[in-house]
Design a protein with these regions (language model features):
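Extended, low-polarity transmembrane helix blocks
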Residues: 1-44, 48-55, 59-70, 74, ...
């Protein structure tokens, strides 16, 4: 079985990287362009996101809202493709740490109470790519010849 695991490991790593990165995109589409309106959030464009961030104490919201949108809409696909994996993972990690603190403040641990359970799982996955890089099947490896 060792050979099977060795063969599958780079593919499963790439699949996890793609899932983690692409999971950010719908959030960016919702917060930036108003897609997926019936998903329980109050922000459906940059201005509403900025106002929400201000209300939640993350000031200035007009600074953070476009950065969050950029991270979700550009950083997510970059992580998915393994492009500048470690720097992008570091930026996403900062965002997710703040998200986890907010989720803990609002709902504790359990996701059905709006807690951090779900976002914590994504945070741990991002830490993996911060530490390990994009892997063999990444644009970093293809273009740079190494994991970045």
């Amino acid at each position: 079985m060792g050979q099977v695991y060795e063969t599958l490991a780079p593919w499963t790593e790439a699949l996890l990287r793609a899932a983690v990165g692409l999971a950010l995109v719908p959030h960016g589409l919702r917060n930036t362009f108003g897609f997926f309106r019936d998903t329980g959030v109050r922000a459906h464009n940059i201005a509403e996101l900025a106002a929400q961030l201000d209300r939640d104490g993350y000031r200035p919201g007009r600074l953070w809202a476009p950065l969050i949108s950029l991270l979700q809409l550009a950083g997510g696909p970059m992580l998915a493709l393994g492009l500048f994996t470690r720097p992008v993972a570091a930026a996403i990690l900062v965002f997710l740490i703040v998200t986890n603190v907010e989720r803990w403040r609002v709902g504790g641990y359990f996701w059905n109470q709006l807690g951090l359970e779900y976002t914590l799982m994504w945070t741990i996955a991002v830490v993996y790519f911060l530490v390990h890089g994009g892997g063999v099947y990444s644009l970093d490896h293809l273009w740079l010849g190494r994991e970045y």
